[in-house]
């Protein structure tokens, strides 16, 4: 593992690391914020998954999360959004290929060789973080847009792994919207039954009551993708039918940008702290 950057930040450290991923068959970069140590108790971790076109640095530089994370004593881990490199399959579109991994395990050539972001986030990256940093095994997960989709499916597919989950403007029903249909048909093939295991709404309908965890979703009502790509009301209906403890907040005037995330990230960190720090 190689440190690329380190910066003092709110009495903690903002770092960027590169490591060779055996899951993705390429070098990967992640960012991590280490809050100032408090006592001898290892701090919990919040994983943040970013959206289309992003890498590990967007949240780090734009969301302004470090101040509150330092206050609460929460480690922030920001992975990249896809495998990277000249040998990694790519596409000219912004919504496919590098920068658009959709946090799933691809089954179709040429994508299946590298595009296993789900396995990377479930197994390899947490194991690496646990082995290299002084952190507890308590963790939560959050994300934006494609990353909100990623956070929700990670939580729904892994009962007991996360204390809580949150999302900003998530793609909740990828099986039914253009971004998801394009990605799933490319990465997973044309069998739409195979798509369902990567769809938050389908996973929530299939969930067990004892596996429900506290869930917070914020959505701006001035988001240009709200009607066509995001459709949070579909997940809210699934949550209602399953009595899943989910809060959906519609935020007037906010769009899809990091200005929206920066406005409400403190709420999300304090939401997760209620459960992470128990």
UniProtKB/Swiss-Prot annotation:
InterPro entries in the cross-refs: AB_hydrolase_fold, Esterase-like, S-formylglutathione_hydrol
Keyword list, A-Z: Hydrolase, Serine esterase
Active site residues of this protein: 145, 223, 256
Main EC class the enzyme belongs to: hydrolase
Gene3D superfamilies: alpha/beta hydrolase (3.40.50.1820)
GO biological process: formaldehyde catabolic process
MF terms (GO), sorted A to Z: carboxylic ester hydrolase activity; S-formylglutathione hydrolase activity
Pfam name, any one: Esterase
GO cellular component terms, semicolon-separated: cytosol
SUPFAM superfamilies xrefs: alpha/beta-Hydrolases
Reactions mediated catalytically: S-formylglutathione + H2O = formate + glutathione + H(+)
EC number in record: 3.1.2.12
PANTHER family registered for this protein in UniProt: S-FORMYLGLUTATHIONE HYDROLASE, S-FORMYLGLUTATHIONE HYDROLASE YEIG
Protein family membership: Belongs to the esterase D family.
Function (record text): Serine hydrolase involved in the detoxification of formaldehyde. Hydrolyzes S-formylglutathione to glutathione and formate.
Stated name of the protein: S-formylglutathione hydrolase YeiG
Gene that this polypeptide is encoded by: yeiG
């Amino acid at each position: 593992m190689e440190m690329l950057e380190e910066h003092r930040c709110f009495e903690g450290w903002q770092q960027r690391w590169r490591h060779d991923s055996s899951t993705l068959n390429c070098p990967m970069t992640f960012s991590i914020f280490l809050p100032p140590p408090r006592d001898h108790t290892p701090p919990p971790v919040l994983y943040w998954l970013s959206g289309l076109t992003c890498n590990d640095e967007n949240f780090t530089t734009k969301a302004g999360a470090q101040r509150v994370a330092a206050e609460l004593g929460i480690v922030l881990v920001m992975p990249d959004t896809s495998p990277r490199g000249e040998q990694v399959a790519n596409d000219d579109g912004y919504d496919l290929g590098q920068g658009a991994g959709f946090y799933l395990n691809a089954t179709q050539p040429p994508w299946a060789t590298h595009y296993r972001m789900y396995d990377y986030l479930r197994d390899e990256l947490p194991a690496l973080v646990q082995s290299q940093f002084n952190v507890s095994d308590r963790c939560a997960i959050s994300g934006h847009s494609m990353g909100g989709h990623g956070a929700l499916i990670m939580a729904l597919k892994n009962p007991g792994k996360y204390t809580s989950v949150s999302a900003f403007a998530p793609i909740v029903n990828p099986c039914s919207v253009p971004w998801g249909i394009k990605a799933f048909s490319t990465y997973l093939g044309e069998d739409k039954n195979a798509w369902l295991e990567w769809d938050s709404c389908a996973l929530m309908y299939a969930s067990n009551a004892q596996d429900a965890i506290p869930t917070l979703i914020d959505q701006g009502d001035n988001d240009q993708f709200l009607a066509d790509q995001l459709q949070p009301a579909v997940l809210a209906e699934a949550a209602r039918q399953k009595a899943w403890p989910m809060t959906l907040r519609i935020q007037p005037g906010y769009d899809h940008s990091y200005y929206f995330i920066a406005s409400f990230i403190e709420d999300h960190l304090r939401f997760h702290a209620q459960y992470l720090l128990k």
